[in-house]
Amino acid sequence: MAHDIHAHRILILDFGSQYTQLIARRVREIGVYCELHPWDMSDEDIRAFAPRGIILAGGPESVHEANSPRAPQAVFDLNVPVLGICYGMQTMAEQLGGKVEGSDLREFGYARVDVVGKSQLLAGIEDHVDADGVFGLDVWMSHGDKVTRLPEGFHILASTPSCPIAAMSDDTRHYYGVQFHPEVTHTKQGGRILSRFVLEISGCEALWTPANIVEDAVAAVRAQVGDANVLLGLSGGVDSSVVAALLHKAIGDQLTCVFVDNGLLRLHEGDQVMAMFAENMGVKVIRANAEEQFLSNLAGESDPEKKRKIIGRTFIDVFDAEASKLDNIQFLAQGTIYPDVIESAGAKSGKAHVIKSHHNVGGLPEEMNLKLVEPLRELFKDEVRKIGLELGLPYDMVYRHPFPGPGLGVRILGEVKKEYADLLRRADHIFIEELRKADWYHKTSQAFVVFQPVKSVGVVGDGRRYAWVVALRAVETVDFMTARWAHLPYELLETVSGRIINEIEGISRVTYDVSSKPPATIEWE
C-alpha cells in the first residue's frame, strides 16, 4: 500500500441531526475518509484521531437551554479548520464568546442567502448575482435559534432577511459557521462548499476512491486472516456478494461460502448465485437446499414476527450443520456496514462488533469460537455498491432492489405454503421483468408482489373460477425512512396485470398498493 488512505481524515461530531450521516456520505463522495462520532467524544480520542478538519453537525436542541450539548474543548485546541453546520455553528458561536438567541421566526425549507462577506469558504461559489452585484445561494434551512452576536475575530459571511448572521467566518483560524445545510441536495452548491472546506481549507487529498478502498481492504483482510480459513454466509444480497468478491480477491481458496436455499428466494435466484460465484468467479460455495426444512417449520404459522423468528432459527440450524462439516475454520465473515456500526452502541467505542440480526448467524460465534472479519464496516451502502463494481460484479446485481432476509416468507401474508411461494415467485418475476423493459426498474427504489391468501372470483371462457389475489408494490425513496408509492404508468400496470393473470393459473386478480410510508411500511409484514 503506497499511501494510507485513512491518513487524511475529517472528524464529524454528531449533535443528533437527521442529516448527520448525509454529511459523512458527502465527504466520502469528495474522496476523503471521515468518521462520525457523538458530540461528547473525549479530548484524548479526538487528539488520537488526528483529523485534518472537524465538522460540527446539526442537532435538535437549543444552545441557550441548560445542559444542551457542547463541542469538546479539543476541537478548538487542535489548530485545525472547523466548520459548524446549523446547531454546530450556534454552539461554536456560543463557545467562542458570541451569542445565540431563540427566534419567533423559524426558517424551515428553501431560502436564499446573500453572500455579504469575503471568505475562502464561499469565494466564487454562487447561484445568482443580482443587479447590485450581490452573490446569492439557494439553500435549505431548518432552524429556530440564530446567532445574534459574533464571537471575536469573526465577520458576517452571509445573511437572509430574518437571519442576519446566516454564515460567519474567521479566516485566520479557519473557523466557519453556516446556518443552512450544505449536505442536503436542496442546497444547490452544497457539494462545492463541503469540497472547498475538506480539500482546500483542510488540505485533505482525495485518496478515498473505490480502487484505493479495495486495495486497502484486501491488504487489511490478508493482515488479519493470514493463512487461516474464513466462512461466509452468502445470501445473494449486495452486502454479502461484495464481501464474497472482496475476500475471494484477498484470500482465494481460504474462503468457503455457505449459500442456504430456503425455498423463499426469487425465481432462479439460487441458480444465479451459484453461476455467478461458483462458476464465473471460482469461489468455493456450498449450496444447502433446505426448502423442505424451512417449509415444514413454517407450516401452520401465520404470525409475521413468529415467521421471521422461525426462518432465522432454521437458517442458523442449516448454516451450523454445514459449517460443522468443515475443518479448520477460524474466521466468520459478515457484511456489517458503517450505518450498522453507528446505530449499534451509538458507535461510542468505535469498536462495537455487532452481528446483523438479519444475517441470522447469531448462533455461530459462541460454539465455534470464530473471530469476525467485517471488511465493509467502514463503508456506507452507496460505497459498497461502488466497491462491488470495482471488483467486477455486474451492475444489475449491485444495484438490485433490497430483498428482505426472510425472503418471500414476509411477502406471503399469513401461512407460508409451497404453492403460494411458487405462484408469488412467478408473479414477482413478471413484474420486475416488465419494470426493466419499460425502464422503470431503476426509477423505483423497491418493487415486488405480495401474495394475499384470499380467493376472488374470475371469469375464464364461459366458466367462473375462484383464484388467489396478489398486490403489486413499488415505492420511491431516498433513505427508506419515508417513501412514496411510485406513480407507474397505467399502461405498464395493465401489461403486468394481464401477464400475471393470463400466464399464472391460480391468480385471478391483481391490485396496486397506493399507500405511502408513513403510515404504511414498505413491506406488508
UniProtKB/Swiss-Prot annotation:
InterPro entries: Class_I_gatase-like (IPR029062), GATASE (IPR017926), GMP_synth_C (IPR001674), GMP_synth_GATase (IPR004739), GMP_synthase (IPR022955), GMPS_ATP_PPase_dom (IPR025777), NAD/GMP_synthase (IPR022310), Rossmann-like_a/b/a_fold (IPR014729)
Keywords, ordered alphabetically: ATP-binding, Glutamine amidotransferase, GMP biosynthesis, Ligase, Nucleotide-binding, Purine biosynthesis
Catalytic activity: XMP + L-glutamine + ATP + H2O = GMP + L-glutamate + AMP + diphosphate + 2 H(+)
Associated pathway: Purine metabolism; GMP biosynthesis; GMP from XMP (L-Gln route): step 1/1
One GO cellular component term: cytosol
Residue numbers binding ATP: S235, G236, G237, V238, D239, S240, S241
Keyword flag Ligase: yes
SUPFAM superfamilies: Adenine nucleotide alpha hydrolases-like, Class I glutamine amidotransferase-like, GMP synthetase C-terminal dimerisation domain
Ligase as UniProt keyword: yes
Annotated Pfam families: GATase, GMP_synt_C, NAD_synthase
Assembly mode: Homodimer.
Protein name per Swiss-Prot or TrEMBL: GMP synthase [glutamine-hydrolyzing]
Organism: Ectopseudomonas mendocina (strain ymp)
